[in-house]
Amino acid sequence: MIGFSFSIVTSWSALSGVLVVGVESGGPPVMIWSWVGVCAVSLAVAYSMAEMCSAYPVAGGQYSWVAILAPKKWARGLSYVCGWFMLIGILSMGAVNNFIAGNFVLGMANLTYPEYTIERWHAVLVAYLICIVAALSSIFLPHLLNRISKAILIWNICSFFICFITILATNDHKQPASFVFADFQNSTGFNKAYAAIIGILQSAFGMCCYDAPAHMTEEIKDARKQAPRAIVMSVWLGFLTGFVFLISLCFCMGGIDETASTPTGVPLIAIFHNSTGSVAGTCALTSLITVVALVCANSLMTEGGRAVYAFARDRGLPFSRALSRVHPTLGVPVAGILATAAVQAAFNSIYFGTVTGFNTVISIATEGFYVSYAIPLLVRILSRVSGDKRERLDGPYSLGRWGLLANVVGFTYLAFAVITFNFPTVDPVDKENMNYTSAASFKFIQDISNQAE
């Protein structure tokens, strides 16, 4: 289960997929120090969620915990909102991962054949292909999930060591320590403080999705121990691998402008090529990460199918009867997986028309997860301060007296992050670079409110 969870969190490769955000908004110092800070507070969130998961191991995860732990008059409404944000986070993150994996493939093609120009529709079609393969494997090869999880954990860790050791060993023109740890880079047009806040978003994106084991609890043995441990361990592994990899990338980075505007569309590929000086070597290293992203696509498809199934089983979705069925022969929620694939493809289709629209999907993906994490933490805080009889949760991961501190620290960070996800990232702001996350979130909340009536 740790392998399954880390294949989704896989922070070191996730950070490389959105590297351009950190490069332009504060540069290496913000990327590195914000990563340390984000991971520290994310551990508070992870331990809080692990405590609830060990007490209530159900496939619904955070929305089920809210339904159980919230005051009765608020439980239904809060659980419903939490479930929808959880679902939109999982589904949109799957689309984002498909896009990132596709970008790696197209970036390698551009590096190998410089005359090839990457078009937006190329990226969408490759994302479609990844989505289809992930859906088919989730439907017809679920019996291989445990083996794949174990194998990808080994592949993930080995790829991490191969990538960072290779670029450090081959790069003979490394950046000075001052560039990595002190020199502030700002291409946003905003002041330094604002740019630093925007730069934190890269770290926030790289450290989420660690709720995945909670949605698999009904299919694993000893779920009260295994799932919470996987939640916590995926954050620890993500922190350590992400920290080392970020420092390695920053030392081996070329010029900021050159890295951010690489024709491959992937700054990581530019850094690999700047270090190795070899197209073949760069493609070999990028291929290692591409495999991680492809397996992540399968894991997110599996998680999404289970989340749709669980929410439909609790009658939280339209067409709940159909979406909550488990195929009698295959033993998986086929309708839930197909619905997940359809929504992912729809999100990817936005890139046909607008880059800004798809960037909004990236923000919504992280915001969806973070809101769904924040609601159960808020419920736990209210339970503790109000003296609710369920103040202490029994389970292998009970936090005891440290629970309130973890809940408060985690909730404070999540609330801050959810607000900053709505900030514009470039000044001057116009209709092309505006951050439409707040508008999309408002429309989403309006829609689920109308459905609830």
Curated annotation (Swiss-Prot):
It is a multi-pass membrane protein. Glycans are attached at residues 110, 186, 274, 435. InterPro entries: AA/rel_permease1, Amino_acid_permease_CS. This is Putative amino acid/polyamine transporter MPH_07630_2. It comes from Macrophomina phaseolina (strain MS6) (Charcoal rot fungus). It holds the Pfam family AA_permease_2. The chain crosses the membrane at residues 2-21, 30-50, 81-101, 121-141, 151-171, 193-213, 231-251, 277-297, 330-350, 358-378, 403-423. One of its GO terms (molecular function) is transmembrane transporter activity. Gene3D superfamilies: Amino acid/polyamine transporter I. GO terms for biological process: amino acid transport. One of its GO terms (cellular component) is membrane. Keywords: Glycoprotein, Membrane, Transmembrane, Transmembrane helix, Transport. PANTHER family: AMINO-ACID PERMEASE BAT1, PERMEASE, PUTATIVE-RELATED. Belongs to the amino acid-polyamine-organocation (APC) superfamily. It is found in: Membrane.
